[in-house]
A protein has these predicted regions:
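Right-hand nucleic-acid polymerase module
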Residues: 1-192, 202-324
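Cys/His-rich zinc-coordinating modules
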Residues: 198
């Protein structure tokens, strides 16, 4: 079966953490800390696992990630921003880094999407999911999926260059888009199930039936695809589905998460094309500050079983902020 977008702990985390799409005032901070606490506890378990795999340096980075957090509450407008933290940047292993990275991608691409849709009336977004047959070897299945996606991309490119000479493919209807690749265990097979979630921006409706036939020709082993239009809240959910790919690895058992990290690190798991090509995603995992506003600086320390505790709070006015 195809993986359909649905609510999950991963999507909840991204939706709640994105200040553009979730509550970001002081009242929401306890829930945010609870999400980060859950993420940090998982990272600590993964750190122990990494230590057992003979990776003490990596274990140390995972264990230190998120052990302190600095928030700024801009109380005149009731906005809370994550100002600083000690991130490990191992987003395939660390849920906190995956949450923050996903939020950055979500905001950057939604901002670009607003511009693209304003400039291209009638353009509509579609969520497209493609899969390959499950298998025991994750590396081999990943390569197989990537080969099929490259074949699909090349077929689109060939048609757009010479539509009179080349066969039309459904992917050619997309003027732009973005995709991510994720992997989990198949519910029925227990084997690795890599798949890609894609956003296509189209004027014409893509045909699921035609795409299924094309996809089977490119893969040789799968015709399972899903195509559905996305509007309003569903559109935000579709982009969340794409950008939560790294966070979903933390829902795997530790040994599977470790294997996926070892297999897929340094692989391109996210890419874009056409009207969504070249979106600038900031490397910084903290929130953008609100300039020229006074704030309360809140320093939270990790206290083990007790979770996060407020260790220090200080009020900063405009003049003090300029000196910091």
């Amino acid at each position: 079966m195809v993986d359909r977008p649905k609510e999950s702990p991963a999507s909840d985390s991204l939706l709640a953490d994105g200040s553009e799409h979730g509550a970001d005032g002081a009242a929401a901070l306890p829930d945010r800390l609870a999400r980060y606490e859950k993420a940090h506890r998982r990272a600590l378990r993964m750190a122990e696992y990494a230590e057992g795999q003979g990776e003490p340096q990596l274990a140390g980075k995972l264990g230190r990630c998120g052990h302190w957090l600095v928030f700024r509450h801009y109380y005149t407008v009731d906005k809370v921003r994550l100002h600083a933290a000690d991130f490990c940047r191992k987003h395939l292993l660390c849920p906190l880094c995956a949450i923050r990275r996903g939020v950055k991608y979500l905001k950057a691409y939604m901002d670009r999407l607003d511009v693209v849709l304003a400039q291209n009336p009638g353009l509509r977004a579609y969520m497209v999911t493609v899969t390959v047959k499950d298998g025991d070897d994750l590396a081999e299945r990943f390569r197989h999926l990537r080969r099929a996606m490259k074949a699909m991309t090349q077929a689109r490119r060939d048609y757009l260059k010479a539509p009179a000479q080349r066969q039309h493919v459904e992917f050619a209807k997309a003027l732009g888009g973005v995709h991510s690749i994720e992997a989990k265990r198949g519910a029925g097979s227990g084997q690795w199930h890599p798949h890609a979630h894609m956003i296509w921006l189209c004027h014409e409706v893509p045909s699921q039936a035609l795409l299924a036939r094309e996809w089977e020709a490119w893969t040789g082993d799968s015709f399972i695809v899903d195509v559905r239009p996305m509007d309003g809240a569903d559109l935000v959910g579709a982009f969340i589905e794409v950008f939560k790919y790294a966070l979903k690895f933390s829902e795997l058992p530790l040994d599977d998460n470790w294997q996926a990290f070892r297999t897929l690190s340094n692989k391109r798991l996210i890419d874009s094309f056409g009207l969504l090509r070249g979106v600038d995603v900031p490397d910084d995992l903290t929130d953008e500050p609100l300039d020229d506003l006074p704030f309360l600086e809140l320093f939270y320390q990790w206290l083990g079983r007790a979770g996060y505790s407020l260790a220090k709070a200080s009020r900063v006015d405009d003049a003090t902020a300029e000196a910091r």
